[in-house]
């Protein structure tokens, strides 16, 4: 037993040497613009809590009331005895919100992509994926028997090349993130849809980082570009801007009926507890009734980005509240993040394998809840630390 998992130890040691080992920070407070880490109050620049909904009073009240009325859990999978009225109400709300015929809720955004891709694709099909798509899309594709082609990131000429060479399939499915989580750029969805229609292909968009952020009342990239009704599959999370937990697929009634019968994560996982489901429903209502959250998000994003650019730091070509500061070296990125934390700013380094080797970064994410004072404090600390590390 002394040699058990020695091969894993060797890899872990290698990760530490190459600065790709991750120390998981523990929060000791509610998620928000400031949080407590290691008994220290710090400005939070690493969460996906874009609109501050994790602590919105309406969501908290909805969750508490649901627990009192329906209990802590559901006790079953959806297809046996775990579908409460509220689960179907949430799906109706999501379908209306995304302007589709129907929707289906999964346990997470990750399992949504796994469930959708693994169930609708066969060996007669081909899936065509952007090279920087999320890991859940990549893993979902691995679960299928379909052929796979990867096109260069947001390169429409390369996408068209792949489409031209893949004419002899039952279905060709183009899959893209709506917003790319590590760079913050938005997929050129109008061009993708135009090519799909030209070559008779299907389109699937993962709006994990766009729902609640882009489009009318946060409906996502499809709505942002005025493409409602022209994208076959929309997927996303209920855990980022929505502020709770889960994932969903939205599309035609035929698609959703099929996923309800074939989507394995949906079929074999216990349904969401009442508190989660009720809070998700309330979040959609808040998006529709309180547009000021999105307005503040974009005001804060514009200000923070302008200050980082003025400072002279190298950013990605972000178009969203995801504002990564490019570092390159993994060790320097980790050092930058650690020093920021010691000075009261929680901004995690992103290193391999989340991004390619040599492309480490500090990924800052701005939220609607940040005050100008908090943003200014964070900017001062970032500038001071960057100068010390000779990044400015």
Swiss-Prot record:
<keyword id="KW-0663">Pyridoxal phosphate</keyword>
<dbReference type="GO" id="GO:0030170">
    <property type="term" value="F:pyridoxal phosphate binding"/>
</dbReference>
<dbReference type="InterPro" id="IPR010962">
    <property type="entry name" value="AONS_Archaea/Firmicutes"/>
</dbReference>
<protein>
    <recommendedName>
        <fullName>8-amino-7-oxononanoate synthase 1</fullName>
        <ecNumber>2.3.1.47</ecNumber>
    </recommendedName>
</protein>
<dbReference type="InterPro" id="IPR001917">
    <property type="entry name" value="Aminotrans_II_pyridoxalP_BS"/>
</dbReference>
<keyword id="KW-0012">Acyltransferase</keyword>
<comment type="subunit">
    <text>Homodimer.</text>
</comment>
<dbReference type="GO" id="GO:0009102">
    <property type="term" value="P:biotin biosynthetic process"/>
</dbReference>
<dbReference type="InterPro" id="IPR015422">
    <property type="entry name" value="PyrdxlP-dep_Trfase_small"/>
</dbReference>
<comment type="similarity">
    <text>Belongs to the class-II pyridoxal-phosphate-dependent aminotransferase family. BioF subfamily.</text>
</comment>
<dbReference type="InterPro" id="IPR015421">
    <property type="entry name" value="PyrdxlP-dep_Trfase_major"/>
</dbReference>
<feature type="binding site">
    <location>
        <begin position="237"/>
        <end position="240"/>
    </location>
    <ligand>
        <name>pyridoxal 5'-phosphate</name>
    </ligand>
</feature>
<dbReference type="InterPro" id="IPR004839">
    <property type="entry name" value="Aminotransferase_I/II_large"/>
</dbReference>
<feature type="binding site">
    <location>
        <begin position="206"/>
        <end position="209"/>
    </location>
    <ligand>
        <name>pyridoxal 5'-phosphate</name>
    </ligand>
</feature>
<feature type="modified residue" description="N6-(pyridoxal phosphate)lysine">
    <location>
        <position position="240"/>
    </location>
</feature>
<dbReference type="GO" id="GO:0008710">
    <property type="term" value="F:8-amino-7-oxononanoate synthase activity"/>
</dbReference>
<feature type="binding site">
    <location>
        <begin position="109"/>
        <end position="110"/>
    </location>
    <ligand>
        <name>pyridoxal 5'-phosphate</name>
    </ligand>
</feature>
<dbReference type="InterPro" id="IPR004723">
    <property type="entry name" value="AONS_Archaea/Proteobacteria"/>
</dbReference>
<dbReference type="InterPro" id="IPR050087">
    <property type="entry name" value="AON_synthase_class-II"/>
</dbReference>
<keyword id="KW-0093">Biotin biosynthesis</keyword>
<feature type="binding site">
    <location>
        <position position="134"/>
    </location>
    <ligand>
        <name>substrate</name>
    </ligand>
</feature>
<dbReference type="Pfam" id="PF00155">
    <property type="entry name" value="Aminotran_1_2"/>
</dbReference>
<comment type="pathway">
    <text>Cofactor biosynthesis; biotin biosynthesis.</text>
</comment>
<dbReference type="GO" id="GO:0008890">
    <property type="term" value="F:glycine C-acetyltransferase activity"/>
</dbReference>
<feature type="binding site">
    <location>
        <position position="354"/>
    </location>
    <ligand>
        <name>substrate</name>
    </ligand>
</feature>
<dbReference type="InterPro" id="IPR015424">
    <property type="entry name" value="PyrdxlP-dep_Trfase"/>
</dbReference>
<feature type="binding site">
    <location>
        <position position="181"/>
    </location>
    <ligand>
        <name>pyridoxal 5'-phosphate</name>
    </ligand>
</feature>
<keyword id="KW-0808">Transferase</keyword>
<comment type="function">
    <text>Catalyzes the decarboxylative condensation of pimeloyl-[acyl-carrier protein] and L-alanine to produce 8-amino-7-oxononanoate (AON), [acyl-carrier protein], and carbon dioxide.</text>
</comment>
């Amino acid at each position: 037993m002394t040699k058990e998992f020695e091969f894993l130890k060797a890899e872990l040691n290698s990760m530490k040497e190459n600065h790709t080992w991750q120390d998981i920070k523990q929060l000791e407070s509610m998620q928000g613009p400031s949080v407590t880490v290691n008994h220290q109050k710090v400005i939070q620049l690493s969460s996906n809590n874009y609109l501050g909904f994790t602590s919105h009073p309406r969501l908290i009240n909805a969750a508490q009331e649901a627990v009192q009325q329906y209990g802590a859990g559901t006790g079953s999978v959806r297809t046996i005895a775990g579908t409460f009225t509220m689960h179907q109400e949430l799906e109706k709300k999501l379908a209306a919100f995304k302007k589709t015929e129907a929707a289906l809720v999964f346990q997470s955004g990750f399992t949504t992509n796994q469930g959708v891709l693994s169930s609708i694709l066969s060996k007669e099909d081909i899936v065509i994926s952007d090279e920087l798509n999320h890991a859940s899309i990549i893993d979902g594709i691995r679960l299928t028997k379909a052929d796979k082609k990867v096109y260069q990131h947001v390169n429409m000429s390369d996408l068209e090349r792949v489409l031209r060479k893949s004419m002899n399939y039952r279905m060709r499915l183009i899959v893209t993130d709506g917003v790319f989580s590590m760079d913050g750029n938005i997929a050129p969805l109008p061009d993708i849809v135009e090519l799909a229609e030209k070559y008779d292909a299907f389109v699937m968009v993962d709006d994990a980082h766009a729902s609640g952020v882009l489009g009318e009342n946060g409906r996502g990239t499809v709505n942002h570009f005025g493409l409602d009704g022209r994208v076959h599959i929309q997927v996303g999370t209920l855990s980022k801007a929505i502020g709770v937990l889960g994932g969903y697929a939205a599309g035609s009634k035929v698609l959703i009926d099929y996923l309800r019968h074939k989507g394995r994560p949906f079929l074999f996982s216990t349904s969401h507890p009442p508190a989660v489901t009720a809070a998700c429903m309330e979040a959609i209502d808040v998006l529709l009734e309180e547009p000021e959250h999105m307005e503040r998000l974009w005001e804060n994003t514009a200000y923070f980005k302008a200050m980082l650019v003025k400072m002279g730091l190298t950013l990605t070509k972000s178009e969203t509240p995801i504002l990564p500061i490019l570092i390159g070296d993994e060790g320097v990125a980790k050092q930058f993040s650690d020093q920021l934390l010691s000075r009261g700013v929680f901004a995690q380094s992103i290193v391999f394998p989340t991004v390619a080797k040599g492309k480490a970064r500090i990924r800052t994410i701005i939220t609607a809840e940040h005050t100008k004072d908090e943003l200014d404090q964070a900017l001062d600390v970032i500038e001071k630390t960057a100068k010390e590390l000779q990044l400015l």
